[in-house]
Every structure is written in structure tokens, then in C-alpha cells.
Swiss-Prot record:
A family per Pfam: IPPT
Positions marked as site (Interaction with substrate tRNA): 101, 124
Protein's recorded name: tRNA dimethylallyltransferase
Protein's organism: Finegoldia magna (strain ATCC 29328 / DSM 20472 / WAL 2508) (Peptostreptococcus magnus)
Gene3D superfamilies membership: 1.10.20.140, P-loop containing nucleotide triphosphate hydrolases
């Protein structure tokens, strides 16, 4: 019998963490984070990391496992996540994977071998030099010439991802977007119940804007300064939305006002990209907050549906 696993996805600021904690309490589950930035230590405010009081009540995995100056990739996540799924399942508990990093989620819910294309250090160094000498826009133009579909999906400031896409194209002769299309193959090694949360776009965007203001009030800039001391501008960790803009401000490249504006703008764009990504998976059971009076209604419906799925009552 296939092991069962609950997955909760959706854009930033929609309530994924809240729903995961609600379900975990009532199902005696453990939670696996699928957030590419919550893996980093000390990056708490900017990643909306689960508060310690909740982590003490419910076991959370794959949070605070990497130093900010270290690199971490999706293949490493996949391997660790599978380990945790097996570990939690061995205790007769249901794992709950929650996060908004589409590639991390798909590495588990879909079939794709990430080690099929190895890195080329020489090529990577050449591409990094192009970025340093001519800027991210020039590097992004190279990707646009060879793989327009990937260029459309990957922001030019996500240098690490742009380089990887170019690298795959040049090493394999195939477009990076074509390889990603293999995500159409679902992973049937596990029995997944995937919940997708969404909301009215304007309401979601207003919540995101408010969240940025709250981050600043909670001491986000002090957090950034602390991380800044142990990283450099090429560190993978500070490519995250919020941190990237903060470091531009700390390096006197933009004003504080422009930093706030960019953080909000880029967070909204990211939420839009997240929805576009997740909508490709037809297995997702979508719950739109605008269709319910209270979030508690969504919690109760999800709990009911999950229990029916767990015990095969439908």
C-alpha cells in the first residue's frame, strides 16, 4: 500500500502555515517545510518562518538546516524530504508537506531526476563573469535567445536559476523548459492529497503589502544586517525576495522608500507566478478564501475531506 501524504500549496500570504498547523494538531501529523528560504538559519522575519511556540507543539522538518552562506538545491531537498516522509510514516503518522516553492513541491509530487544534468564549473564561471561584468539583464538576454519560455518564467535577478537554465541548454542541447515539462509525469510512489489555497487577487495583494510593512516593524532590517555580515551578494540565500531588495538598500543602490516599494511589487509578482505554477497540477483541490466567510470554514472542510481520503470513505 502506498504511503499517504498531505500537501498544502498556494501563493505567499494565503494561510498555508495556519492550515497546516490546524490539520497537524487534529491528525497528530508532522510538518515538512517546502520553502526554499526557510531552510536557512536566522532568516526568520523575511521568510515568515513558523513561530517557535508552534514548532514546540508540532514537529517541523527542514527548517533552519542550512547556514546563510551555504548553497542548497532542489535535489538535496528532494532527498531529505523523502527521508522525512519515510521517517514520519514509520511512526504511523501522516506527513504534511507545506510550502510555496513550486520546484520543491514538484520534486516530490512529480517524477524528475535532477542528477541527470551535472554542473559544468567552467561554463558556470563564464556565465557568472558575464553577470558581474555586464549585469543580470545581459545574462537573461542569453537565456531569452536560447529558451524564451524559461526566460519568461525566470526573473533576471534570479541569477542562480538563469545560469542553471543556460547551463542545461548548452550541456544537453535541450531547452530547460522542455526538461521542466517532464513535471507532467506524476509521482505515484505516494498517495498525495493536495490542497491549494487561493484568494481574491486584490485582497491577496493587499495582504502581501501589509505583510511587508509588518516585516519592517518586526525588525527585518536588523535581521538583514546580521545576515549581510556572513554572506556576499552572490550568496544563494539573499536572492530571496525581501532580502535582495534590502541588500540593495544597504549597499546604497536604492532608497528606503524604493526598497519597500520593490519588496511589495516583487512579492506580488511572485504570488502570481506561484499560482501559475500550481494551476498546472490537476490533482489539486482548490479552496478559494473569497468563497468562505471565515478561514475556520476552510479548515473544517479540509479536515473533513482529508479524513474521508485517509479512511477511503468516498
Amino acid at each position: 500500500m502506498r504511503k499517504k501524504c498531505i500537501v498544502i500549496v498556494g501563493p505567499t500570504g494565503v494561510g498555508k502555515t495556519r492550515l497546516s498547523i490546524f490539520l497537524a494538531k487534529r491528525l497528530s501529523s508532522e510538518i515538512i517545510s517546502a520553502d526554499s528560504m526557510q531552510i536557512y538559519k536566522y532568516m526568520d522575519i523575511g521568510t515568515a518562518k513558523v513561530e517557535p511556540k508552534y514548532q514546540r507543539v508540532i514537529k517541523h522538518h527542514l527548517i533552519d538546516i542550512v547556514e546563510p552562506y551555504e548553497n542548497f538545491n532542489v535535489e538535496q531537498f528532494k532527498n531529505l524530504c523523502i527521508e522525512k516522509i519515510e521517517e514520519i510514516s514509520s511512526k504511523n503518522k501522516i506527513p504534511i508537506i507545506v510550502g510555496g516553492t513550486g520546484l520543491y513541491i514538484n520534486s516530490i509530487t512529480h517524477k524528475l531526476e535532477f542528477n541527470a544534468v551535472k554542473s559544468d564549473d567552467k561554463l558556470r564561471e563564464e556565465l557568472e563573469n558575464i553577470s558581474l561584468q555586464y549585469g543580470n539583464e545581459k545574462l537573461h538576454e542569453i537565456l531569452e535567445d536560447i529558451d524564451p519560455k524559461s526566460a519568461d518564467k525566470i526573473h533576471m535577478n534570479n541569477v542562480r536559476r538563469v545560469i542553471r537554465a543556460i547551463e542545461v541548454c548548452k550541456l544537453t542541447g535541450h531547452k530547460f523548459s522542455e526538461i521542466n515539462d517532464k513535471f507532467d509525469h506524476y509521482n505515484d510512489d505516494y498517495d498525495f492529497y493536495i490542497i491549494g489555497l487561493n484568494d481574491d487577487r486584490q485582497v491577496l495583494y493587499e495582504r502581501i503589502n501589509k505583510r511587508v510593512d509588518e516585516m519592517i516593524d518586526e525588525g527585518f532590517m536588523a535581521e538583514c544586517k546580521y545576515i549581510y555580515e556572513m554572506t556576499d551578494e552572490n550568496s544563494q540565500s539573499i536572492q530571496a525576495i525581501g532580502y535582495r531588495e534590502a541588500f540593495m538598500y544597504l549597499n546604497n543602490k536604492i532608497s528606503f522608500k524604493d526598497m519597500i516599494s520593490l519588496m511589495k511589487k516583487n512579492s506580488r509578482k511572485y504570488a502570481k507566478r506561484q499560482l501559475t505554477w500550481f494551476r498546472q497540477d490537476k490533482r489539486i483541490h482548490w479552496m478559494n478564501l473569497k468563497d468562505f466567510r471565515e478561514f475556520e470554514d476552510i479548515e473544517q472542510i479540509c479536515l473533513k475531506n482529508v479524513k474521508e481520503w485517509l479512511y477511503d470513505k468516498r
